[in-house]
Structures are given as structure tokens and as C-alpha cells.
Amino acid sequence: MKIDSIMVGPIMTNCYLLSDETAGVCALIDPGDEAPRVLDMVARSGCQLQYILLTHGHFDHTTAVRPILEQYPERYYHDGDTLTLGSLTVTVLETPGHSKGSVCLVAEDVIFSGDTLFRCSCGRTDFAGGDYREMLQSLGRLGNLPGSYRVYPGHDQPTTLDYERRVNPYVRQGMKYHGAAGHAGA
């Protein structure tokens, strides 16, 4: 598994390329803007683009989708869906709160968290479709996942789930909230 990233657009959104180099396939995650740069990253990987995956529908994560879709097909996915990317399995976890339809994508020991989870913070819930209670449930769902994960957020620097469990007040509150609601775990 290889992860490449570039920051795109005026809000500096992280766009990721998840690759299985052995199989020669890749998935593009949150192509927020600057389609030529994004497509160049795909071309430089030498891998065949198999998926374009969006963590949510806000413009800063989707602006480059239209020009990229002119070259690649689209597919919709839902909570619990698994996508095969070479030898990798990507699992979709619905994580509403920042927006309706927000998801996190889990591949091996990696979580692509979009605007659900940031280093020491979480995504805003004051936009249309945002809901603080849903955000706490989503953060609790992530925090209660068994194991250790590297977290690649939609903005700012990567982190680890272990670190966020210890220091992120939103994850800590979400884990209590999620557990109290009787929905602990994935």
C-alpha cells in the first residue's frame, strides 16, 4: 500500500492517491480542485485509476471530480460496502455530522477521515446538513474501532487514532456518547 497526497484548492484540501503498486491500481480520494495536478499525480503513479472516492460532497473535496469523470466511471457506495483495490480492501464507514452522507474510508491500518476527524479536532457542524450529535456518534464509532490506525484527514496533517483517543476532546466525548448509546465498535 502506498499513499501519495497533494494539497489542492483555496482551502488547501488534502487529495490522496491510495495505490497497490504490485497490482498496478489506485484510488483517488477527495479530488478537491486543480484537476490537471490531480491527474498528473495519477499518471506519475503508473497505476490504473480504479476508483474516485469522496468522503463527502462539499465543494472543497469535489471540484475536480467533473473533469476527472470525463475519463473515468462513477460509482456510489454506502456504509459497510467494501471495495477491492488490488490486494487492498477499502471499507466504507458512514460518519455523518460534518455533512449528511459523510464517510470515512478504511484500508488496512489507515483511515481517510475527510472532514470528520482532524488532528486534535473535528469537522465543523454549523453548515447545512451538519449535526453535532451525529458528529459525536461518528467520532465515537471511529474511536471505538479496535486496533491502531494512521489517520489521513481532509485538511491539515496526518495523525493516529491512538493519539486522538488520548488527546482529542471530541473523540473522547464521542466515545462516551457512542458507548452510552449502545453502539460501541464498528
Name each model feature, range by range.
Residues 12, 23-26, 33-91, 166-174:
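Active-site HxH/HxHxD metal-binding segment of metal-dependent hydrolases
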Residues 1-45, 104-114:
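Conserved beta-strand hairpin/beta-sheet module of binuclear metal-dependent hydrolase folds
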Residues 4-7, 19, 78, 84, ...:
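Residue-level detector of conserved, well-ordered beta-strand and adjacent loop positions
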